[in-house]
């Protein structure tokens, strides 16, 4: 036997199909519901479960929209549909009913035609329920369902923040444009005022109050400017190099000043509104990064829910996509931060610590966004706790740098830096003080010293190689020093011997020249004359 489940605003109805053979011909099923009598021959009401109130109806319909049976529907089917085949309009609902209640469910074109026919003759198939009763029920349920959907819409509040931050950025651009226009326009008449007053709002207020610069000496600017700036303004107005302007020009300049002031007032109101909305919707995110940065992150992500699905690495560079893709294309270093760079925590950090702090802040920001988007609590305790942790980490990083600068780094200074002759072994401590080597005193020529330098270098290299190859056979430092001293003395003695030999040869040569006889000198002179002739 086939039973048809039909959902209405008044309750659930089960209809029994009298002639199941007609379901085979789908095209002719619609003809069976042309009249109430033919419809009664096709189906018959078996059971009806009425909703007690609107809240019960809303709960049941909300479950059906999700593809799941409500608690009342499960009880109704268990009581009236055991061992029967159930025809349903939603295949997903049929799968859940079959899995949980063990009731066979069908869903095909014939079932849809049956439901269409039942809908057309519903008030005739159920006695005591007319259109005048069903219409207000349907209207009330539709309104309740609309409110339910709006209540749990993920985009209902994000839109306000996205539009507010977008308008705030546009107002900043307009304010800057209008303020610069006022400065350029009024600068022809009073150019010195631009250097005296740097703030755009104060500049517009002063221009609106003063008008022509001649009036500056008679006016009181104490409500707008400080005493020193007011004195400078009045002094500059007397000796100004600007040109004269007509009253019509001043009228338009003052109207532009009114526009600047009205825009600045509205911007302040809009900022207060954005601040209140951010504290209500995303309190933890606001506690970590502030109202403006948090609102820009939500606007860039599309919504708070979409932003909560992003990992920390994506949130860290959100807003720097152009730089990221350029770096990937050119194979350079990728950016370390995007919109999160404007957070106060990143701004407080030193330049070399900004990357670390932005990475930590992005990780905590993602956690805060997920709590705000999916959590039930509306307080900002989690955001304040994470902010305190990040501030402690920042102080820790700065403290390490201060410790390195002041000399309080980890470990003690290595004594090898100050005494290179110290041995690294357990028995090798600081070597004894060096004594003056008297054997090294000698009068040597520059050439002999130069010739000795390469030989000494070679000897040192050979000794180093031997020491590296046989580290285990190292002798105590005192013996090595004695050997070095002996080698140096031997080298000096050899050089001294060579010098003595050279001096002896020179002396012999001089003696031979002095011992020559005058006869030999005459013979030499005669030989020279003959050679000339």
UniProtKB/Swiss-Prot annotation:
One example of a Gene Ontology biological process annotation: ribosome biogenesis
Main location: nucleus
Keywords recorded for this protein, A-Z: Nucleus, Ribosome biogenesis
Annotated GO MF terms: mRNA binding; snoRNA binding
The organism's place on the tree of life at top rank: Eukaryota
Protein name (database record): Probable nucleolar protein 5-2
PANTHER family: NUCLEOLAR PROTEIN 5 NUCLEOLAR PROTEIN NOP5 NOP58, NUCLEOLAR PROTEIN 58
Pfam family, one: Nop
Keyword Nucleus: yes
Compartments it resides in: Nucleus, Nucleolus
Domain Nop, chain residue ranges per copy: 281-399
Region described as Disordered: spans on this chain: 401-433, 445-533
Compositionally biased spans, kind Basic residues: 521-533
Role: Required for 60S ribosomal subunit biogenesis.
Gene assigned in the entry: NOP5-2
Gene Ontology cellular-component terms listed: box C/D methylation guide snoRNP complex; nucleolus; small-subunit processome
Keyword Kinase applies: no
InterPro entries: Nop56/Nop58, NOP58/56_N, Nop_C, Nop_dom, Nop_dom_sf, NOSIC
Biological source species: Arabidopsis thaliana (Mouse-ear cress)
Record family assignment: Belongs to the NOP5/NOP56 family.
Compositionally biased region (Basic and acidic residues): 413-424
């Amino acid at each position: 036997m086939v039973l048809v489940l039909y959902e209405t605003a008044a309750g659930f109805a089960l209809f029994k199909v009298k002639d199941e053979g007609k379901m085979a011909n789908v095209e002719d099923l619609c003809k069976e519901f042309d009249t109430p009598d033919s419809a009664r021959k096709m189906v018959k009401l078996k059971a009806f479960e009425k909703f007690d109130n609107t809240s019960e109806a809303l709960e049941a319909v909300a479950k059906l929209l999700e593809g799941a049976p409500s608690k009342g529907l499960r009880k109704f089917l268990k009581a009236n549909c055991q061992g029967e085949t159930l025809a349903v309009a939603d295949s997903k609902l049929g799968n859940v009913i079959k899995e949980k209640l063990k009731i066979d469910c069908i869903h095909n074109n014939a079932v849809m035609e049956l439901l269409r026919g039942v809908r057309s003759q519903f008030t005739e198939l159920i006695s005591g329920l007319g259109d005048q009763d069903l219409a207000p029920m349907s209207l009330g349920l539709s309104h309740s369902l609309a409110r339910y959907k709006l209540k749990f819409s993920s985009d209902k509040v994000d839109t306000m923040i996205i539009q507010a931050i977008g308008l705030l950025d546009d107002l900043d651009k307009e304010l800057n444009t209008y303020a610069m226009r006022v400065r350029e326009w009024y600068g022809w008449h009073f150019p010195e005022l631009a250097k005296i007053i740097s703030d755009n709002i104060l500049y517009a207020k002063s221009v609106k109050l003063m008008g022509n610069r001649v009036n500056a000496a008679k006016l009181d600017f104490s409500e707008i400017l400080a005493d020193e700036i007011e004195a400078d303004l009045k002094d500059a107005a007397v000796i100004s190099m600007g040109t004269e302007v007509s009253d019509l020009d001043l009228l338009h300049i003052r109207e532009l000043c009114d526009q600047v002031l009205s825009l600045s007032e509205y911007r302040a109101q809009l900022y207060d509104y954005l601040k209140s909305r951010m504290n209500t919707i995303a309190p933890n995110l606001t506690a970590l990064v502030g109202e403006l940065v948090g609102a820009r992150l939500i606007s860039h992500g599309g919504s708070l829910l979409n932003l909560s699905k992003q990992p920390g690495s994506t949130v860290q560079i959100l807003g720097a996509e152009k730089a990221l893709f350029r770096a990937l294309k050119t194979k350079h270093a990728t950016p370390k931060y995007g919109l999160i760079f404007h957070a106060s925590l990143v701004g407080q950090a030193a330049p070399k610590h900004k990357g670390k702090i932005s990475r930590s802040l992005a990780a905590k920001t993602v956690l805060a966004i997920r709590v705000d988007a999916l959590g039930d609590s509306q307080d900002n305790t989690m955001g304040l706790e994470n902010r305190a942790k990040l501030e402690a980490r920042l102080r820790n990083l700065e403290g390490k740098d201060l410790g390195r600068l002041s000399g309080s780094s980890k470990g003690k200074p290595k004594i090898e830096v100050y005494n290179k002759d110290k041995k690294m072994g357990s028995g090798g401590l600081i070597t004894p003080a060096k004594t003056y080597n008297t054997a090294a005193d000698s009068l040597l020529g520059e050439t002999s010293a130069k010739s000795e330098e390469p030989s000494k270098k070679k000897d040192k290299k050979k000794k180093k190689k031997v020491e590296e190859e046989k580290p285990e056979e190292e002798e105590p430092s005192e013996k090595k020093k004695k050997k070095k001293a002996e080698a140096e003395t031997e080298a000096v003695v050899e050089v001294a011997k060579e010098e003595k030999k050279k001096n002896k040869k020179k002396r012999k040569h001089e003696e031979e020249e002095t011992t020559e006889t005058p006869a030999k000198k005459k013979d030499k002179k005669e030989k020279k004359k003959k050679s000339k002739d």
